[in-house]
Amino acid sequence: MVKRLLLIFIGWFCMMEIAAQIHGVVVDANTGEPIPYLNIYYDGKGVGTVTNNDGEYSIAYHAGWTKLTFSMVGYETQEIIVSAKTSELNVRMKEIDQMLDEIIIRPKKEKYSRKNNPAVEMIKKVIASKRRTDLKQKDFYQYYKYQKIMFAKNNITADTLRESWLFKQYPFFRDQVEVCDVTGKNILPLSVDETVYENVYRKEPHSEKTYVRGINSTGVNELFSTGEMLTTVLKDVFQDIDIYQDRFRFLQYPFDSPISEAGIRFYKFYIMDTIYVERDKCFRLSFVPNNSQDFGFTGSLYILADSTYRVKQCQLNLPKKTDINFVDHMVIDQKFGELPTGEWTLLEDDMLCEMSYLKKVLGSFLVRRTTRYFDFNFDPLPNRLFKQKGKEIKDVNAMMRDNEFWSKYRQEDLTQSEQRMGSFVDDLTKIKGFKYVMFFLKALIENFVETSTPDSKVDIGPINTMITSNYIDGLRLRASAQTTANLNPHLFLKGYYAYGFKDKRSKYMGEVEYSFDKKEYLPREFPKHSMTFTYQYDNMLPSDKFIHTDKDNVFTSLKVCTVDQYNYERKATIKYEREREFGFKTTAFVRYANYEPCGKLFYRTMAGESQLQSAIANGRLSGTEWVHSPFNTHDITVAEASIAFRYAPGETFVNTKQRRLPVNLDAPVFSIQHTLSVKGILGSDYTYNMTDFSAYKRFWLNSWGNIDVYLKGGIQWNKVPFPLLIMPAANLSYIIQEETFNLINNMEFLNDRYASLDVSWNMQGKLFNRIPLLKKLKWREFIGVKCLWGKLTDKNNPFLEQNRNDNVLMMFPGHYNAAGGYDYSSYVMDPHKPYVEITAGIHNIFKLLHIEYVRRLNYNNLPTANKWGIRFMIRTVF
């Protein structure tokens, strides 16, 4: 039965048809030369395309749409009758000199120029008039926004409906299928999410707030405890577009608006004709990117043919040649109008996107976003609307709205399939054996196993940490679990037990977290306000604290070199965390920690080393292996208090069952932390102060991609042994880990002052697109450089004669050789010579795989230096 159910799901996602396509070449009737960037569209349907550089085009046939329009400035517009039998349609366009209200339109074969271009002059007038339509010039405004996002399986063919065993055996699948009124294709809606927002604005003192008044979500995403991830990602990827802004973010990329100064440089504009949109006479302007490979839209602007130069309607299409993953076809249609009070604003915003990945296996999907703006008010607003913290405030009852609420605020009726979504999901869950399929899928997707359905109180996992190995444990088995809000929405428990068959020791961790705010499923849901107590005993690499994944992740446990210097760490931590809605986070903790070296790592003070050498010289000790010398320090203990502040305005993320994953990488991040330990308090062996800071920012270079910059620095202010010095963030696995060095070994450089710079440039295929094969593969080039400046002051340098017999400083890590000599594996950096490594990579292989070659440029004379390596990562990006 389980196999049969798996086949059902495989069959479900494999349903697909090859849509009827009309293709051909458009040429100049006189010269026979192909015409690039010619508009081809179904008039009034909002669906169209443009020819490529060779005049070629392809557009889907839609049942019932019989007229295909071909138009281009300087040519006669042609309307050609098409049918389901039309597959190849080559068109010859006749040149003309058009005149539009005394504006001369020159033939297309002339070189495009922005100077003295009537279309460009018209766009400049639109830009000049933008301020008059800006609602933020008002003292106050208030309006409501209704948004619906529907996600569906796309392109269900008639043959599939008729012959597929899935539809034959389970009729409710057939009942869920409906026809998309835009594409004319059969679709199978899988989820629908409705949200009602109230937006308020005050000019002086400036304040903007968005209140989430209602949320209604149904669909297959509800079958997963972290199903809100789909909604969060869709909302971030398909953000609202405001063409009156100079730049907007969409598909996680910045786009220049066609009505911006940058847009004039980025796009080519053509005046097409004059038409009536509703009752308003408009100029229709078409625009295309200068380079079809650049991230930009094609489309049309309908400009009022009067002195206001307002945008009446905007249609945006994403060219298929644009180097964006997964998007087969996209159309955005925005309509503007005049309010009863005279203001001009956006009223309707519709988006439809057809997407696919591994199309022959998974088929294609459709995302449709419907947005309506209504109930505008420009009267003074009460102060209470602006007193809440944060820019977006969610009503406590937002997810519990009744039918009366939705009858009032729902601006677009749900389709029959959308109305049946709840019963469709119920029918899915009633299939015999369905729970076993979901068990498998949840373990695969969420990396956790739920102990009950539908409301799991305890989740077992992470699955990928159950069986691993390392130098200390040998074979390591681990069992982990965590409670959910279904057990208690405020109190959460988490822990694991692990056993190493080599050292024959048990390791464990227990955590109790109390959330002051009620949670829906996980304690890390934003905004976080909690108190946590954690107790842990385990073996750790000093570099484990730098990786973002679990240290027992089976994929990162495979190291690029032999790593044999570990600690047994026993930690007890009390931590307080408070996040604010505007992106500010405060973290404070008190920690007791005991570090016992293991493997090839040992602690020995410089005074202890002098005693050891004296004992050897006097014949009191013999041998060549002194890792377990009687003059070693068995362990060290510290008790520290720390306060940290983090500011990340505009940051968005999704919650998995393990951690948060950032969604909006455009948000800057700034943090600062100070840690204090006082000798004698809670058994601490040392007094020290440590200060750290970091900053991150992404910079976009238009069509040249983006540059990510990480800047970090820190100071250890006091004299401390090497375990408490600053060590580089080293990545010892083959998996790419951001914010780490790829070729620095475990504790290779020890400093008490440091600064690091990590700059990476993802060129988004700008160079590869000039190579035909690579252009077709959509590979993307990537380069980066990582630099580390470090300094070890005299007070912490064990190699100086003045510290030869110091009771605090310890020998740097290393290994005894066969001759009894000591080979250091940790070194002091030259403060005038930064460590540098560079990266050159190919991203987006199969739209999934990232491979990078890393090269170390200096400090290669060190005996432990790794000069180069290969790293990889699985990640999907648009």
Each PLM stretch: what is its role?
Residues 42-44, 69-80:
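A short, solvent-exposed loop/turn motif at the edges and junctions
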Residues 109-282, 288-296, 359-461, 465-468, ...:
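Structured extracytoplasmic
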Residues 21-35:
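Structural motif
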Residues 1-25, 40, 97-104, 523, ...:
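Bacterial Sec-dependent N-terminal signal peptides
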Residues 45-56:
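Short, acidic Ser/Thr/Gly-rich low-complexity loop/linker segments typical of extracellular
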Residues 27, 72-73, 88, 92-135:
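Short, acidic, small-residue-rich periplasmic hinge/interaction motif at the N-terminus
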Residues 32-36, 58-65:
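Short Pro-Gly-centered beta-turn/loop motif in secreted/extracellular proteins
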